């Protein structure tokens, strides 16, 4: 049987990335909560910066 989690970085970025979070009011709330908590990474895409 095929497992349900089939990871793809593009899909991960597009669904949970920084710009996606900024697009909605609740997403911005998520980011501000993570800033307030002092998270090292705010979102998925901030970790996956291309060099």
Curated annotation (Swiss-Prot):
InterPro entries: Ribosomal_bL34 (IPR000271), Ribosomal_bL34_CS (IPR020939). Residues 1-19, 26-40 have a biased composition (Basic residues). GO terms for biological process: translation. It holds the Pfam family Ribosomal_L34. GO terms for molecular function: structural constituent of ribosome. It comes from the Bacteria. One of its GO terms (cellular component) is ribonucleoprotein complex. Residues 1-51 are annotated as: Disordered. Residues 42-51 have a biased composition (Polar residues). The keyword Metal-binding does not apply. Keywords: Ribonucleoprotein, Ribosomal protein. PROSITE patterns: RIBOSOMAL_L34. Belongs to the bacterial ribosomal protein bL34 family. This is Large ribosomal subunit protein bL34. The gene is rpmH.
């Amino acid at each position: 049987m095929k497992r349900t989690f089939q990871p793809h970085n593009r899909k991960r970025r597009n669904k949970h990335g920084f710009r996606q979070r900024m697009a909605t009011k609740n997403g911005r709330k998520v980011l501000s909560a993570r800033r307030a908590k002092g998270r090292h990474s705010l979102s998925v895409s901030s970790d996956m910066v291309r060099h």
